[in-house]
Amino acid sequence: MSIFQNARFYTTVNHMKDLPATRAEVAFVGRSNAGKSSAINTLANRTRLAYVSKTPGRTQHINFFELGDECFLVDLPGYGYAEVPEAVRAHWVELLGRYLQTRQSLIGLLLIMDARHPLKELDRRMLEFFRVAGRPVHILLSKADKLSRQEQNKVLAEVKRELADYPSVSVQMFSSLKKTGVDVVEQVVKGWFDALPPQDDGMAEL
């Protein structure tokens, strides 16, 4: 059974002080409309676990989904969407930044990028930002179905080349529509959980 199959909504928060008690957490982050919520739904084999919108910027809080009793999937606000009030955008930046750099229970980051437009400036900033935390990042080049196989291979090779200086970063093609790459994501995330010390092993209840 997929490690994501038991995912269910737990809580949503808008301030660091409201974060739930610590469990092992894997967070999803990406530019607005990169396919982040669709990726979560596809991995969980659900249609409406995470809200999917054609309007960028709809994920405005940190949403927690529990896996068993000891693990969370975390859906973070999308970045790069300009059509929100400055005060709201500033709050997102602070909330996202503090969570990524200070959340001790965060064991890995799934960074979603549109395969047609990978490694935009804000994506690169996110990689540098999270580098400080010293935890692994796995990039999903989403919407791969929009590219031919030849184009996919070219994009994947180019992204890997540009990430040569990031030893803790891995990358793959992914399509929510075609369910391409689901098994690879599961293996990566399971590896993160399996690497936890036994007393914190969030896979025990999955």
UniProtKB/Swiss-Prot annotation:
Keyword Magnesium (UniProt): yes
GO annotation, biological process: division septum assembly
InterPro entries the record matches: G_ENGB_dom (IPR030393), GTP-bd (IPR006073), GTP-bd_ribosome_bio_YsxC (IPR019987), P-loop_NTPase (IPR027417)
GO CC field: cytosol
Signal peptide: none
Cofactor or coenzyme needed: Mg(2+)
Keywords tagged on the record: Cell cycle, Cell division, GTP-binding, Magnesium, Metal-binding, Nucleotide-binding, Septation
PROSITE patterns: G_ENGB
Pfam families associated with the record: MMR_HSR1
GO molecular function, one term: GTP binding
Family in the record: Belongs to the TRAFAC class TrmE-Era-EngA-EngB-Septin-like GTPase superfamily. EngB GTPase family.
Function, as annotated: Necessary for normal cell division and for the maintenance of normal septation.
PANTHER family: ENGB-TYPE G DOMAIN-CONTAINING PROTEIN, MSS1/TRME-RELATED GTP-BINDING PROTEIN
UniProt protein name: Probable GTP-binding protein EngB
